[in-house]
């Protein structure tokens, strides 16, 4: 039609047609037909309306009362395709796009190109029976192809002179204005009288207008009036049009995003929806660990706990070195991030920062419990840091659920940091006890770092009293550990462990250890003997004692134990430890339950010990009591979420073990101690296997769960230098409940084994593999 119209001279016809043609159906056939209008009965001047000279009159219908025109008009035969509606409307759009009135600017332009003046011609009365009776369509302009315009005048009224009815005029006017406006603005709204009532035609928006409107909608689903006015002015639309467009767009958006709660905000499923949804989709909180138990909450505010620990920690840690301000540095590290943390803080970050960087299990654990731990870990857990950082990734899964665990895990370090101070002891214990998870988390942190093990802040915090031993341990550890450290920067955790423990734990370097010893006395006071235990060989036992004590305290022993483990790695003990672990492991059948109560920590410790066992499981085992912290800290997360708990991340890997460990009697596998690689993955943790390669693994299969029976006290050894953090969360569970007290060793042993196995759980299987490949030390990384 458009083409036809354009070809025709009849000007206004085309324009009218364009504006008016609501009917696609108006298909005008070029063939001209002359029908006696009269025969049609009422010839309607349709054309007049549409400007399309098509008048479709059904026999019974007189369009607009135009008298039937006897004269034959040459008309393009409007096939009945024309909608009858056209008759009703009394106007046709000849344009093929009649369905959209003014929908396309091009149409409007096209019509305009036709001589606009011809509207009158367009109005010519066409008498046609649209009904198919005869389509006497008087297409004045556009419609009749080759139909002489002159023909129109032939209409009875005289084509041109056809009386213009008010409705015709109205239409013309609206058409003209709309055409004029249309070119500038697609959104012309015409009111066409239908049945004598004005009807608002659909507004057509130009691509430009639509683009701008969509763009605006993308940024703002709702417009304020000033902005609406501005847009209307810039787009040549009316305010109402803009407002209505936005309303419609919002509804469209809503439909698109029904599945999404965010329908309003999201613009389009294409544009707004995706964008909005993405933005709205709850971004993961940095601190997934926020949910950690209240006990660990301080940790989550790494600062508060860190600061608490700071004093003791700082003191203990001072020897550690710059890391000493583990709390602050850790916190920074933590917040800054696990992985990145190069410094101690970084290592802690893994534990502590997880919340942010890890945003995995680490996050929660760390945040909640890690701060202190982190601090402690700061020095002690650099290695851990790496391990953790990787671990933190693993963490994420278990992390949320096992937040407490994670916390504990982190806490372990933290706790140890706290442990440094008597308060820490109470806190650690309290944590451990009050929130099996939360508390556990705290202690474990250290341990987990302990992957850093002993050294990890936990040692200090954990074993304030323990530290004296840790000194020994540290010495040994330093010897071993340093070698280990030297061996593995990755083992930094050990390094840090060692350092930490050493520095922190009143290791050879540190006074803090003295403090810790004092603390140890406090912590240890339940088991004063732990001093002996401290000593490398006895460390296990001591750890156990400490464990007992520290279960609650969260691991001062743990740390020491770990240190010792690391230091001694007490391989011989390790074997012993191994056995112990096994025995211990067995004890911690509680698995998750333990996990919940002390056992859980123990489990952690456990595993750590297993791990430690692997590297220095001994420490852990010994620390079982504190291990809770240790375990918690590290394995806590593991525990909490088995697999997720990797607050340490890698250790978390053991998470699988985690759960197992919880379930499996500590999921001993969970050694976060990726360090435990040495221990065969035999642990029984399925998951842990990867980790538990601890040589001591003998207990490995089940984490030494089965080993549980093995030497509770003696367990301590497992020097797997690498790290304790793999510690047996898993192994520890059973231990934990009773293990705490008793389990220290038993659980520790179990834990160690378990820990070994679990070290890398799901997330860090690869890490654990690496760790396994490289060495327990490497596991610290995990």
Curated annotation (Swiss-Prot):
One of its GO terms (cellular component) is nucleus. Coiled coil: none annotated. Residues 198-257 bind DNA. CDD domains: homeodomain. Sequence-specific transcription factor which is part of a developmental regulatory system that provides cells with specific positional identities on the anterior-posterior axis. Controls development of mouthparts, and labial and maxillary palps. PANTHER family: HOMEOTIC PROTEIN PROBOSCIPEDIA (PTHR45664:SF2), PROTEIN ZERKNUELLT 1-RELATED (PTHR45664). This is Homeotic protein proboscipedia. It comes from Drosophila melanogaster. The lineage of its organism: Eukaryota, Metazoa, Ecdysozoa, Arthropoda, Hexapoda. The gene is pb.
């Amino acid at each position: 039609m458009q083409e036809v119209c354009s070809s025709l001279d009849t000007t206004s016809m085309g324009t009218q047609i364009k504006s008016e043609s609501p009917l696609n159906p108006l298909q005008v056939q070029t063939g001209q037909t002359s029908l006696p209008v009269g025969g049609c009965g009422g010839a309607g001047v349709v054309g007049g309306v549409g400007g399309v000279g098509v008048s479709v009159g059904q026999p019974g219908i007189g369009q607009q009362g135009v008298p039937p025109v006897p004269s034959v008009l040459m008309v393009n035969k409007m096939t009945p395709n024309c909608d009858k509606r056209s008759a009703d409307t009394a106007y046709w759009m000849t344009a093929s796009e009649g369905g959209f009135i003014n929908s396309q600017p091009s149409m409007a332009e096209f019509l305009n190109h036709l001589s606009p003046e011809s509207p009158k011609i367009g109005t010519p009365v066409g008498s046609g029976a649209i009904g198919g009776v005869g389509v006497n369509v008087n297409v004045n302009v556009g419609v009749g192809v080759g139909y002489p315009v002159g023909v129109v005048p032939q209409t009875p009224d005289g084509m041109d002179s056809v009386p213009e009815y008010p409705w015709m005029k109205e239409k013309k006017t609206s058409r003209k204005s709309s055409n004029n406006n249309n070119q500038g603005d697609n959104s012309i709204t015409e009111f066409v009288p239908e049945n004598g009532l004005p009807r608002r035609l659909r507004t057509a928006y130009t691509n430009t207008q639509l683009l701008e409107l969509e763009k605006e909608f993308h940024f703002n689903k709702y417009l304020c009036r000033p902005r609406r006015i501005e847009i209307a002015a810039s787009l040549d639309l009316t305010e109402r049009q803009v407002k209505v467009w936005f309303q419609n767009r919002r509804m469209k958006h809503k439909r698109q995003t029904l599945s999404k709660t965010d329908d309003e905000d999201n613009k389009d499923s294409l544009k707004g929806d995706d964008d909005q949804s993405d933005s709205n989709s709850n971004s993961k909180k940095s601190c997934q660990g926020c949910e950690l138990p209240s006990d660990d909450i301080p940790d989550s505010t790494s600062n508060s706990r860190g600061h608490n620990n700071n004093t003791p920690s700082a003191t203990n840690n001072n020897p550690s070195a710059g890391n000493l301000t583990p709390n602050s540095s850790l916190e920074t590290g933590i917040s800054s991030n696990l992985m990145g943390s190069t410094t101690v803080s970084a290592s802690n970050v893994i534990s502590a920062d997880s919340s942010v960087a890890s945003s995995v299990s680490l996050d929660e654990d760390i945040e909640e419990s890690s701060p202190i731990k982190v601090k402690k870990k700061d020095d002690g857990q650099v290695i851990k840091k790496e391990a953790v950082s990787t671990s933190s990734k693993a963490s994420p899964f278990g992390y949320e659920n096992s937040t407490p665990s994670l916390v504990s895990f982190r806490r372990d370090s933290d706790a140890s940091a706290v442990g440094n101070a008597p308060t820490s002891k109470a806190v650690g214990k309290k944590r451990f006890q009050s929130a099996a998870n939360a508390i556990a988390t705290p202690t474990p942190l250290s341990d987990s770092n302990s992957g850093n093990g002993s050294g990890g802040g936990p040692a200090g915090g954990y074993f304030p009293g323990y530290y004296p031993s840790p000194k020994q341990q540290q010495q040994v550890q330093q010897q071993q550990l340093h070698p280990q450290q030297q061996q593995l920067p990755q083992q930094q955790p050990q390094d840090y462990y060692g350092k930490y423990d050493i520095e922190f734990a009143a290791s050879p370097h540190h006074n803090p250890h003295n403090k810790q010893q004092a603390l140890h006395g406090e912590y240890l006071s339940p088991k004063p003997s732990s001093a002996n235990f401290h000593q490398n060989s006895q460390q296990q036992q001591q750890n156990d004692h400490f464990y007992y004590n520290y279960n609650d305290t969260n691991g001062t022993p743990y740390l020491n134990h770990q240190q010792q483990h690391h230091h001694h790695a007490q391989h011989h003990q390790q074997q012993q430890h191994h056995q112990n672990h096994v025995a211990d492991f067995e004890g911690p059948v509680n698995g998750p339950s333990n996990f919940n109560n002390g056992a859980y920590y123990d489990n952690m410790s456990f595993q750590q010990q297993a791990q430690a066992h692997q590297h220095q499981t001994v420490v852990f085992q010994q620390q079982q009591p504190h291990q809770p912290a240790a375990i918690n800290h590290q394995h806590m997360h593991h525990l909490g979420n088995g697999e997720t708990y990797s607050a340490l991340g890698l250790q978390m890997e053991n998470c699988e073990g985690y759960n197992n460990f919880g379930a499996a009697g500590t999921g001993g596998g969970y050694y976060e101690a990726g360090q435990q690689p040495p221990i065969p993955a035999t642990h029984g943790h399925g998951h842990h296997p990867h980790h538990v390669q601890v040589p001591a693994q003998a207990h490995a299969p089940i984490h030494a769960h089965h080993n549980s029976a093995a030497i509770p006290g003696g367990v301590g050894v497992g020097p797997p230098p690498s790290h304790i953090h793999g510690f047996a969360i898993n192994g520890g569970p059973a231990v934990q409940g009773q293990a705490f007290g008793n389990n220290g060793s038993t659980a520790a042993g179990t834990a160690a084994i378990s820990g070994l196995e679990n070290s890398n759980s799901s997330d860090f299987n690869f890490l654990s593999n690496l760790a396994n490949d490289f060495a327990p030390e490497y596991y610290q990384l995990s």
